[in-house]
Amino acid sequence: MRDISLRPAGTRGADTAATTLPRRPRRDEPFTPASDARPLLLGHGGRLTVERLGTVAYGPAWELQDELAEQRRGRRIGDRLLLVEHFPVYTIGRGGDERNLLASPARLREIGAEFVRVDRGGDITFHGPGQLVAYPIVELRDPLDLRRYVRSLESAIIDTAAAFGVEAGREEGLTGVWVAGERKLAAIGVRVRRGVTTHGLALNVNTDLRWYAEMIPCGIRDREVTSLARELGHAVAMELVEERLSGALAAAFGLILAPIPTGLPGPAGASEQ
């Protein structure tokens, strides 16, 4: 497995600030979904193993996704969930319009951000400190049912936001999760190749929303972007959001959550099924 340089999550961004937090769920406490979505039920009755990678550049995380996805297709590993924060980067999907990136190359260098073209669906989005990015590497029972998979991701985000007192939902005709139908809380962009998913979701937790001034988020001009911190009026502990989102995704997929310690992934090719 590739060696990737990591920094502890939370070393950048507002999540280190003092905050009023919801009750921390017990490790053995079952997750109860707040949304009305039924589990995706991936069909193999396996576990969802969580890997917290900390803060990492986009490129190495993308390479790691591809490597793990190939191992998953070969049944050498079970389903994985990568949780990361990225250094500032704007990414654009296969069908995206590069005119939605407003910053020039010189401006990107000035603000210290990358621009990367990727193989997911969707348009342009931002990743950076204070944002929780989740990359499920899972085998779908029905690879053609991409819409249901995306709705499962949306349900998990809605449930997670509810756990912190933020009421969020879907907006007809648009992907992602929204607050009051006007403010985008989370973006989704995925790829399914030979039945296994890559890419995933980006949930604004304590994100500095000024980064979004350099782009037209997802190509949508008439909506705002928000974060849990903005909606609540205070910063939120990233670790708690990671725990709730992991449980929500496992519930949405119909899998058993099996977290592993923070840090580098385990040995490549190790069996987890």
PLM features: what roles do these ranges have?
Residues 98-104, 185-205:
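Short, conserved beta-strand/beta-arch hydrophobic-aromatic motifs that form part
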Residues 156-164, 244-255:
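Generic non-transmembrane alpha-helical segments
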Residues 239-245, 249-253, 264-273:
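Cytochrome P450 proximal C-terminal region
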Residues 134-136, 175, 188-190, 201-205, ...:
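A structural signal for short, well-ordered beta-strand segments
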Residues 1-185, 210, 235-236, 266-273:
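N-terminal lobe of the biotin/lipoate ligase/transferase fold
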Residues 206-250:
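A hydrophobic, small-residue-rich beta->alpha segment in the mid-to-C-terminal subdomain
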Residues 167-169, 254-263:
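Flexible, glycine/charged-enriched surface loops at secondary-structure junctions
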